[in-house]
Amino acid sequence: MALARPGTPDPQALASVLLLLLWAPALSLLAGTVPSEPPSACASDPCAPGTECQATESGGYTCGPMEPRGCATQPCHHGALCVPQGPDPTGFRCYCVPGFQGPRCELDIDECASRPCHHGATCRNLADRYECHCPLGYAGVTCEMEVDECASAPCLHGGSCLDGVGSFRCVCAPGYGGTRCQLDLDECQSQPCAHGGTCHDLVNGFRCDCAGTGYEGTHCEREVLECASAPCEHNASCLEGLGSFRCLCWPGYSGELCEVDEDECASSPCQHGGRCLQRSDPALYGGVQAAFPGAFSFRHAAGFLCHCPPGFEGADCGVEVDECASRPCLNGGHCQDLPNGFQCHCPDGYAGPTCEEDVDECLSDPCLHGGTCSDTVAGYICRCPETWGGRDCSVQLTGCQGHTCPLAATCIPIFESGVHSYVCHCPPGTHGPFCGQNTTFSVMAGSPIQASVPAGGPLGLALRFRTTLPAGTLATRNDTKESLELALVAATLQATLWSYSTTVLVLRLPDLALNDGHWHQVEVVLHLATLELRLWHEGCPARLCVASGPVALASTASATPLPAGISSAQLGDATFAGCLQDVRVDGHLLLPEDLGENVLLGCERREQCRPLPCVHGGSCVDLWTHFRCDCARPHRGPTCADEIPAATFGLGGAPSSASFLLQELPGPNLTVSFLLRTRESAGLLLQFANDSAAGLTVFLSEGRIRAEVPGSPAVVLPGRWDDGLRHLVMLSFGPDQLQDLGQHVHVGGRLLAADSQPWGGPFRGCLQDLRLDGCHLPFFPLPLDNSSQPSELGGRQSWNLTAGCVSEDMCSPDPCFNGGTCLVTWNDFHCTCPANFTGPTCAQQLWCPGQPCLPPATCEEVPDGFVCVAEATFREGPPAAFSGHNASSGRLLGGLSLAFRTRDSEAWLLRAAAGALEGVWLAVRNGSLAGGVRGGHGLPGAVLPIPGPRVADGAWHRVRLAMERPAATTSRWLLWLDGAATPVALRGLASDLGFLQGPGAVRILLAENFTGCLGRVALGGLPLPLARPRPGAAPGAREHFASWPGTPAPILGCRGAPVCAPSPCLHDGACRDLFDAFACACGPGWEGPRCEAHVDPCHSAPCARGRCHTHPDGRFECRCPPGFGGPRCRLPVPSKECSLNVTCLDGSPCEGGSPAANCSCLEGLAGQRCQVPTLPCEANPCLNGGTCRAAGGVSECICNARFSGQFCEVAKGLPLPLPFPLLEVAVPAACACLLLLLLGLLSGILAARKRRQSEGTYSPSQQEVAGARLEMDSVLKVPPEERLI
């Protein structure tokens, strides 16, 4: 018997029921009309159990299967359909109507059991439905909607409605009240108007009418003041009275309200035509041409001022003026007084009404041969080129012809008093008429050079120097009053001026180091109470650095006077060593032969640091005559060749220590430094102590260096120091940090190991180059060397120290497994592992070098095994199933990652569930990413907010889902998509994914109802094996996640449908595969998903004006109307008018009117404005093969032998047109034509006769037209063979 789908009636059973229903009335009717018959043969129930007796017409019976009658008792309730069910005849099945259930449909389904009604509504269970009785303020089928009582706008007069649950509240506009703001409030009810004012009610206010009360204000509260309206004019003062007022006027004003401005100019007080100005006129104050200074004031408005004509002055213009009294003539001009004026007689070189103009004599360009003119008073100076001289550069200089200057010098020609000569401009370090004197000399440290110079010159020092020392005095100049010094301080230049032993000014150029061994030119000079320091250097702006400052020199002398007329100078000092040249003191050159002692001529020296003498990374310092090596610790010695020996503490586990007894205590500022190398995280490094207590203690704790002083907080140095590398440790302490240090210094531990335990126990490792304030505390005796090295400090005692930094033998016993080779790496070891093994001790086997995975899968190492990782393609097939029953249940599964691409809008990516309490899933819902985690502990779980990001686009997407706090029992879960920096938090809390591993692990399903590709899928960092190992590959020690038995292998590789084979793109469009979708790159002129639509670029009306024209390649062109231009005819173009904006160059005429005027260019010109000159033959005017030749700016045609004329337009041999009447030419021409026609007819007859005679033979000559070329015959065709002749 076929099984019916649950909830669907059996068709055969339904048919039986219908037959019963139709035949039952008929049988009843027959039963009532047919007469009773004798008892049936079946009355004795002769048939066997399970069968039914049927009487026959002959009075017998037959036994057959029993008819079903299980529904006869109507066992189904509530209108359910009863259908008999076999094989039991009494069997039946009830098909319930909606709303009921149970074997007999006796149970009414309570639709209210799921509590569908919200907000406290009452649920009423009905047949196959429910009904929610909503509380006040809610509506909807499930009372999910809150009723907005404000929707009907119940609040009047602009009131704001605040919706509540089942109610509303009106916030009324000012001036209204009531539950619905329907009441206009009467603000006059409180009688706000005082002093009998009348109140008028307004909306949200009132107005007091104070007329007739004598008061004013909002409430008629202020008495009216008559002066408040400022009735007095011209800033007069108003005196308040009882119902009246009085104005006090300023002088010059009158009237009851001071409204009258008295006219002081009415009597014409100004003489000689002077202009009278009233002081009461405000327009005469302020501005550029104001008659009165300052601002207008009524206090000074009385009176007048006379503006006198030229030549007069005084209060009333009664005094005549002497114009020369003010000395108006400038620059020594003589003033001559004139009536109402003056005249200046100017000296030479000046001009102008007041001789204020300096006559520029250079305006006449007096300088010749390119000379530059500089104007002077009543003259000029010409700066001539090198080969010219004289006042006007008119004389060619010949003085350097045959000069005897040396090659390094420059000859400068001179022309003076009509005589040609020259001078030699010497290079640095030389002097003399022919640069024969050497000015270069060397200065040694401690041997300064003394010199005397004549007094009276400008106070200054100038020289060139070179040195490698950073400090020292270059030169000093002294006399009875002032002293000037030029020195190097920290390798930079400094100048100091003293006056009577008092420092007046110090100038510095701090930005350039000058101890580089190169020559540098410097100068310091005092001029016009300003001291200026100059340095010529490439690093300066414009190659010159300047520092200057004002100087105020003392007037009294206190220094010991030197001999009259002599100043002294000193070159060098106790520290400076180098070379000087071109030294000038107060402008006087100091030559080496005049200096006396300590002078070494020339500047010869060897660079001290080449080749580099310092080893072990030491830095070489060139000290001019010798060198110094600044050694990197722990190296020492003149060339850093020696190393301060290190000491190994605790070698072999034996406690070690060293103690020092200081001869004297360190100063208030203490610096402790040493080199440290260790792999131990704890141990005592150094401790100051006295006989009773410990002072400063430096020790290792948890790999960090700590320094402790009693009574002060500990100092912890950042970072870890126990990495086995050598580190320089330097600690500095101030006077307020250290009190009583003690004279004993314990290093590496105390004599008794137990005494070191509070600070981590005895130290194990290496210490080297221990210093206190730069002084050594050596663990072993140091060899004697030069005094530049740090000195030793204190006595020494040591126990179990090993010289050098010696490592423990970490390879004994051998820690490497599987044949690894052990190498000692200072208190550590390194195992070189053979193939297929890795790890610190080669204990971890590598599986992937054996290539256990077949392409396209790749092998990925996992703990105790490997996984074949690959991309896989799924096509709505069965999902890939995996199990983590072999995975360690102790491993934390705090997240998963998955890569996929699909265009499905509904699909499962990953799904696993352990009952209803634990599970994880990722899916695509409506084209967006969805997911969630249920982690037990009675929590509802965490769900990704919807809608999630869109992912059904065919592109690869990478999802990472992880716990925010993996170590916690429950945590938020975070999701990263495609490497986003900010994750999305799932709503809710859940625990980890431990239910996916261990013996009770659940099945993990991938790609269920999914079409697309999966990439790497990992749980807790362990990938799932989408690909299987190659046959015969050795399995790993543990298979963490395995394929579920019976799961078919997926299709490896990501392969989309062949959407571009054949290409769906029309009209030569290029198909682009987008994974289960395609896109067409259409050619010009086509568009649409398949390039099926012809592009009309003019359809969108791109042209703002004019007409749009389509090109065959799909482009459009806007053809603009007059007055507009641009690609889309948007730009207004001014009309072209010959008299307005069209200018034709070189005399070419402008033709045409607005808007299209243009230029008609003359011969030889071209361009829009005839601005381009053309070559005469550029247009080639010659005809009939003539050659154009340009001659004198015009073209000339050279014709061949058959033509002539200006343009070769006339053919030679043809009669020229004659100046005869037309008839005299036409008649002879007609006769000639008739004669030619007759001759042609005769020739044709003869040719026909000749052709007939040649029939039956082939003669190529017969195919030719007599007297003509072969290709000119347009009637007869040449046979192919004839073309070869």
From Swiss-Prot:
One of its GO terms (cellular component) is protein-containing complex. Apical polarity protein that plays a central role during the epithelial-to-mesenchymal transition (EMT) at gastrulation, when newly specified mesodermal cells move inside the embryo. Acts by promoting cell ingression, the process by which cells leave the epithelial epiblast and move inside the embryo to form a new tissue layer. The anisotropic distribution of CRB2 and MYH10/myosin-IIB at cell edges define which cells will ingress: cells with high apical CRB2 are probably extruded from the epiblast by neighboring cells with high levels of apical MYH10/myosin-IIB. Associates with the gamma-secretase complex via interaction (via the transmembrane domain) with PSEN1/PS1. Interacts (via intracellular domain) with EPB41L5. Interacts with PALS1. Residues 1-350 are annotated as: Required for maximum inhibition of APP amyloid-beta peptide secretion. It comes from Homo sapiens. It is linked to Focal segmental glomerulosclerosis 9: A renal pathology defined by the presence of segmental sclerosis in glomeruli and resulting in proteinuria, reduced glomerular filtration rate and progressive decline in renal function. Renal insufficiency often progresses to end-stage renal disease, a highly morbid state requiring either dialysis therapy or kidney transplantation. Residues 1249-1285 are annotated as: Interaction with EPB41L5. Residues 431-603, 647-805, 871-1054 form the Laminin G-like domain. Pfam families: EGF, hEGF, Laminin_G_2. Changing residue 643 to A: In VMCKD and FSGS9; uncertain significance. Glycans are attached at residues 235, 267, 438, 478, 669, 690, 786, 800, 836, 886, 926, 1009, 1141, 1158. Changing residue 629 to S: In FSGS9; moderate loss of function mutation. The gene is CRB2. Disulfide bonds join 71-82, 76-94, 96-105, 112-123, 117-132, 134-143, 150-161, 155-170, 172-181, 188-199, 193-208, 210-220, 227-238, 232-247, 249-258, 265-276, 270-306, 308-317, 324-335, 329-344, 346-355, 362-373, 367-382, 384-393, 400-411, 405-424, 426-435, 579-603, 609-620, 614-629, 631-640, 766-805, 811-822, 816-831, 833-842, 1013-1054, 1060-1071, 1065-1080, 1082-1091, 1098-1108, 1103-1118, 1120-1129, 1138-1150, 1144-1159, 1161-1170, 1177-1188, 1182-1197, 1199-1208. This is Protein crumbs homolog 2. InterPro entries: ConA-like_dom_sf, EGF-like_Ca-bd_dom, EGF-like_CS, EGF-like_dom, EGF-type_Asp/Asn_hydroxyl_site, EGF_Ca-bd_CS, Laminin_G. GO terms for biological process: circulatory system development; establishment of cell polarity; establishment or maintenance of epithelial cell apical/basal polarity; heterophilic cell-cell adhesion via plasma membrane cell adhesion molecules; ingression involved in gastrulation with mouth forming second; maintenance of epithelial cell apical/basal polarity; mesoderm formation; negative regulation of endopeptidase activity. O-glucosylated by POGLUT1 at Ser-267; consists of an O-glucose trisaccharide, in which the O-glucose is elongated by the addition of two xylose residues. O-glucosylation is required for localization at the plasma membrane. N-glycosylated. Keywords: Calcium, Cell junction, Cell membrane, Cytoplasm, Developmental protein, Disease variant, Disulfide bond, EGF-like domain, Gastrulation, Glycoprotein, Membrane, Repeat, Retinitis pigmentosa, Secreted, Sensory transduction, Signal, Transmembrane, Transmembrane helix, Vision. Gene3D superfamilies: 2.60.120.200, Laminin (2.10.25.10).
